[in-house]
Design a protein with these regions (language model features):
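C-terminal engagement/docking regions of AAA+ P-loop ATPases
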Residues: 8, 17-97
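Histone-fold modules and their flanking histone-like tails across chromatin and transcription assemblies
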Residues: 1-14
Length: 97
């Protein structure tokens, strides 16, 4: 079971990557679908039939790492994709249970 608030959370994360100041090419809607599928799998592995925000937070870097491209100036500054993904995640408020 996936609550609408979790789906909205994933959509917000994807939207942030498309408007983030250090990201040149953000994640596509398909990346959001893959985050959702991965989060459902993680929930099942933990014996749950529901997804929690921490599932999304844990798996988002794994799903997005190869799907976004940093701006050249961000790369020159030494920023890493994982750092930018973490900043993006931190900027989106997770739903409360």
């Amino acid at each position: 079971i996936v609550e609408p608030s979790i789906i909205n959370y994933i959509v917000s994360i994807i939207a942030k990557t498309r408007n983030w100041h250090t990201i040149e090419v953000g994640a596509s809607p398909r990346a959001g679908v893959n985050i959702l599928l991965a989060a459902r799998a993680m929930a099942a592995c933990h014996g749950r039939d529901f997804v929690v925000p921490d599932d999304v937070k844990t798996l988002t870097p794994w799903v997005l790492r190869h799907r976004i491209r940093l701006r050249p100036d961000a790369e020159i500054e030494g920023l890493l994709v994982d750092d930018v993904i973490r900043e993006t995640l931190d900027s989106v408020e997770a739903p409360r249970r």
